[in-house]
Every structure is written in structure tokens, then in C-alpha cells.
């Protein structure tokens, strides 16, 4: 997408790779919306930490980051023996896989890279194939999101108020996004609408990232408290809900997404509001048979017990926000916290799943698995 930096529009991707210094290039999302910065991560362990620490986050973005990280780790190997290289690659794979356990995109992305590497007969050949496959995954992610936009745009009519949760925009993918893709496509087709962004505590990705994206795209929006969605639905001020997913079960249609998604689905169902989930094919898990089998990441208590931000009086001129983002304890100083990062929404609460191949009912996914890149 195009980003306005110091008054100039610059096109950039959330994730990219610099082959010259074997570094993964990431937008430092923890600084947004107050500062735009691209960081270079130069080894696979650092790339795994960037995923875990949420320098980069979002299903497609961490999938592409893991794919590049696997290629990065492969390219860092200096030996010539394939047996030693295979052991090294296993270490790289497991390190990246364990960075964020709930999302399935990193595993699918790395499996795609490893499958491509098998045709190489030497270490250098496999290293080259790894980077080519990672680039292919990243480009495919963009293509999938563009297709999601085209399929989902017709759901949006002029005058609508749309609710979204967390950030499933271009920052959560390589470009374009999933939940935002229909919005961007509808905007390009001339439709005018308004978006409510849940703040999405505790990391506030809706208030910081989605709101920043929509402002960049000049789409009218308001940030709302997480608990305000029910009130707005009750008053008839929300017409449509579109969210993303970190893992969607192809066998059942259940959806794991940022904590609070299930709550919004229950509210939408109660008020008869269509609730859609937008996903690329890499987000589909064809193996698990129940949402209760999805590993739910539990993050640090500090995320719930405090908040990040900048002083309200800080100047807004270029560069003035640097190093101003700070953490403040909000909760009672002796209280602990529980911090599940995700929840699971059952299929019966979901109106449809927007995919690159079209829109399907959640329980249709298994029957359409060949069309959606699933098993035979």
C-alpha cells in the first residue's frame, strides 16, 4: 500500500527480504501510529523474536516472515553436507514455528518452502530454492488478499457502517489485507462507507494499526472501546462485521482470531448482523478436527495490566515521536492478570468466509477443499 511519510507517498510491503545482507525487512509495528520505521533482522533467531515480540504480527505477515526466516536460516549455513544442513534447517523451522503457536500461516508457509527445497541436490541449490519459494509465498499472499477484496466488495454498500476487530489489514499481511481488502476494493469502486475499529485490548491493534491504515486510505472511521460494539448494534448503527483469522479449521469452519472476536460474533448473531471472516488459503488448517484442539497463546500479564502510548502533549512534527512510546501500569499494582491472545468462534455464528476462491459457508470448506488448496 501507499504510505504517507513526511508528506510523500511511498509504496511498501509489510515484509520483504534483502538478499544482499540476508535480512528480513519489517515495518516496526509497535511504534505505529506514532512513528514509521523499517527494521532489518539479520538472523533467524532474531526473526523469530520479531514474530514473538510483535514487531510483525498478523496471519499473513508472520507467515511470510517465517518463510523468509526459514530461507534466511538456510542461507546462513556454511557447510556443504546435506545431512548437517537438514539438521540445521530443522532447528530453524522449530524456532520459527514456536514463536506464535496459535497461527497456522507460519507452518503452512515454511512447509511450502521446504517442499520446494527438496528438488535441490546440493546445499547451494536448496538455499536458492528456499528464497525463491519464500518470495513466491509472499507474492501469493498479496494475490490472495486482492482476490478476497474482489469477492467481498459486493457485501459493502454506500452508507454502511462496518465493524472490524483487531487488525486484519495490509499490516497483518504482505499487502492489502484480508478484512480490509473488501473495504479497499469497495472504496476503489466509488462506494462511501464508515468503519468502526474496536480498540482491541490489550495490544490495541484496532486503535493503533487499523485506524492508522484507514486514515492513510482516507476511509471515514471511529475508534471505539471494545465494550461499545453491543451498544452500537442495539441502536442499529452497525450493518456488517468483517474480521480476519489466525487459523480457520477446514473440517469444521471454526475460526481462531484475536481475543474478543467470539464476543463480537455472539453480539452480531443476537442482532441479526452479517458476520464475515476473510482469509487467504494459508490460514486454513485442514488437519485439526475441533476448535478445542487449537493451541491458544497466553501472553505476558503486563499487556493486560498496563498500556503503551505517547504523552498527549508530545509534538507531532516529523521525527518528534522517536523513543516516546512508553508503557504505563494501569491496574492495581498487586493484581495478576490472565492474557489469552485468541478465542475460537464456532461455525454457526459465521455468515460466510471470504476466500480468494469466493465466499463460502463455514461448513462448506471441507466439501470445497480441492478448490481451496486442501487435501484430496
Describe each model-derived feature in a short phrase.
Residues 192-193, 198-376:
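Conserved phosphate- and dinucleotide-binding cores of soluble alpha/beta proteins
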Residues 31-33, 70, 169-170, 247-250:
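A short, flexible beta-alpha/helix-coil linker loop
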Residues 39-55, 154-162, 246, 323-336:
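Short, hydrophobic/aliphatic alpha-helical segments
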Residues 27, 65, 69, 163-167, ...:
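Short beta-strand segments
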Residues 25, 31, 37-47, 77-95, ...:
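PLP-dependent amino-acid enzyme catalytic core
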Residues 1-45, 52:
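Positively charged, low-complexity intrinsically disordered leader regions
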